[in-house]
C-alpha cells in the first residue's frame, strides 16, 4: 500500500501530524475541515485587492497577494508569498503552503497545496493533494466525483480498495508535472516526479513515481523517465 511518505515531503509543515496519523494518504482528505477548525486563527497579513472577496475564517500569511475578483471562502489557510490570482475561487477547507499559486479561473475545494505547488490557469482541484513543486498545466482537471455517485474505488495490482470517500480527486506526489488539458479520473494516486502529457486522461489507479503517462487512443501508456 502506498503511504504519504512515498508521495510527499511534509516534514516541518504544520500539517505533518495529520499526514503521519493517516493510515492511507487519502484519509487526510476527510480530516482537512476538522484540522482547520482546530488550528486556524483568522488574520489577514497579506494584500487583498478591493474587488476581491475574502470571507471570515481565512488566514493569509505575510506576502500573500489576492488579485482582483478572487473569492476565498473559509476555512482556508494560505502560506507566505503565495498568490491567488484574478478570478480564482477557493471554496473553503483548503490549505495552501508557501510560494504557491492558485491561478486565474482556478477552482479549489477541500484540498492541500504543499509548498511551491502551482495551479496557474483554468484548473479544477477538488478533494486533492498537490505535493511540493507540483505544476498543473493550463486546463488541468482533477475530477473528484464518479458518475454513479458511489464511493471511489481504487484499482491497483488487481485489488479493489474502497477509499470510503464519495469525493476523491488526485494525490500528486512531489514534483509531478501535468500538460495542458490533462484530466485525472476520480481516485488517482501519482508518484513523485511523474509527467502527465497534454490532453491525457489518467484512469483511476496507483502509479509509481518517475514515469511519463500519456494517452494512446483510449489506452494509457506509462514508461520510465530517463
Residue ranges and their predicted role:
Residues 31-77:
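Long amphipathic N-terminal alpha/beta scaffold segment
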Residues 59, 77, 95, 171, ...:
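ABC ATPase A-loop
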Amino acid at each position: 500500500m502506498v503511504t504519504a511518505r512515498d508521495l510527499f515531503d511534509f516534514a516541518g509543515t504544520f500539517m505533518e501530524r495529520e499526514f503521519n496519523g493517516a493510515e492511507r494518504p487519502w484519509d487526510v482528505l476527510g480530516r482537512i475541515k476538522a484540522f482547520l477548525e482546530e488550528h486556524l486563527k483568522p488574520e489577514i497579513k497579506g494584500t487583498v485587492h478591493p474587488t476581491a472577496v475574502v470571507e471570515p475564517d481565512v488566514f493569509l500569511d505575510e506576502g500573500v497577494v489576492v488579485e482582483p475578483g478572487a473569492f476565498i471562502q473559509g476555512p482556508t489557510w494560505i502560506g507566505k508569498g503565495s498568490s491567488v490570482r484574478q478570478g480564482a475561487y477557493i471554496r473553503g477547507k483548503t490549505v495552501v503552503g508557501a510560494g504557491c499559486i492558485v491561478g486565474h479561473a482556478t477552482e479549489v475545494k477541500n484540498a492541500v497545496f504543499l509548498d511551491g505547488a502551482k495551479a496557474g490557469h483554468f484548473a479544477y482541484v477538488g478533494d486533492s493533494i498537490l505535493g511540493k513543486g507540483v505544476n498543473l498545466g493550463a486546463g488541468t482537471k482533477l475530477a473528484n466525483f464518479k458518475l454513479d455517485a458511489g464511493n471511489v474505488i481504487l484499482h491497483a495490482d488487481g485489488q479493489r480498495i474502497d477509499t470510503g470517500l464519495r469525493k476523491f480527486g488526485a494525490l500528486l506526489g512531489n514534483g509531478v508535472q501535468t500538460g495542458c488539458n490533462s484530466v485525472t479520473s476520480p481516485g488517482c494516486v501519482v508518484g513523485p516526479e511523474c509527467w502527465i502529457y497534454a490532453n491525457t486522461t489518467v484512469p483511476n489507479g496507483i502509479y509509481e513515481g518517475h514515469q511519463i503517462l500519456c494517452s494512446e487512443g483510449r489506452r494509457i501508456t506509462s514508461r520510465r523517465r530517463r
